[in-house]
Amino acid sequence: MEVVIVPDAKAGGELIAESIAALWRRKPDALLGVATGSTPIPIYDALTAKVAAGDVDVSSARVCQLDEYVGLPAGHPESYRATVIRQVVEPLGLGPDSFIGPDGSAEDVQAACEAYDLALASAGGVDLQILGIGTDGHIGFNEPCSSLASRTRIKTLTEQTRVDNARFFDDDIDQVPHHVITQGIGTILEARHLVLLATGEGKAEAVAQTVEGPVAAVVPASALQLHQHATVVVDEAAASKLKLAPYFRHTFANKPVWQGL
C-alpha cells in the first residue's frame, strides 16, 4: 500500500486524474470504477479539464459504478446512476455504451447483483477503481463486519451512513434508502489498481485504522492492505492521525517519476 499526503483536496484530485489519464493513454478502453459522494468531485473536475484541453482521448473509455441505492424510482436525481451520468459521463463526453452499472430497481435484486459481477468480468475487469471511505471505515457500502471475500450483494445501511448521506436528500434522513447494491470487498479487490481518496479531519481516524491498523472486517477499508497495487491519497487533515506520516512523505518525495501512482 502506498500512502500519498497532499496539501488539499484539489491537489489530490489532480494527482489521481493524471493517473487515470495516463491509464487511458496506455489503454484507451480501460474500465474506470467510479465512486460517488462529494470526495471524488475534484478528481472528476480535473479529469474533465484534461479532456477539454485535449490531454487525453476518452472516445473508447469506459466507466462502471461501485454501488446503487435499492428502490429509488427510475431517474431519481440522487440514484447513483444519475449521479455518475451527471458528474462523470456527461462532463467527459462519454458515449451511452461506455457505462456499466447495477440495476437497483430490479424486482429480483439478488439476480441483479450476480448479473453485475458477471458484467464486470465480461468487460475484462476494472482497471482502476476510485474509492472513498466512510467515517466508520466502509468502502462502497461494505459496512463494518462485511466479509472480506464478499461479492456484489444487497446491504442494509447503518444509521450513521444514512445520516452522512442525508445531505444529498435535502437533509431529510427519511428520504435516504435503507438498502443498496454494492460491489463486495472481494469484488473490489479484483480491480487492478485501487485508489482511495480521503479528505478532511472527519476521515482521519478511519484512515489511520485503514493504513496502520490490523486487517479486520470491522474496518472494511483495511482490506486494501491485501491488494498488490493500492494507493491511499489523503490531505493533511485526513492524515493528521497517521503515526508514519513523515515516512509516507519521504517515500513519495523520493519516488521515481516514471512509476506514477
Give the location of each predicted region.
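A glycine-rich beta-strand to alpha-helix segment
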Residues: 29-30, 38-39, 43, 119-144
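Short beta-strand segments
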Residues: 33-37, 65, 102-103, 130-133, ...
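A glycine- and small-aliphatic-rich helix-loop capping segment at beta-alpha/alpha-beta transitions
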Residues: 46-57, 80-82, 144-154, 213
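A short secondary-structure junction signal
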Residues: 111-113, 140-146, 150-152, 206-210, ...
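ATP/nucleoside-binding phosphotransfer catalytic cores, i.e., glycine-rich phosphate-binding loops
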Residues: 186, 190-261
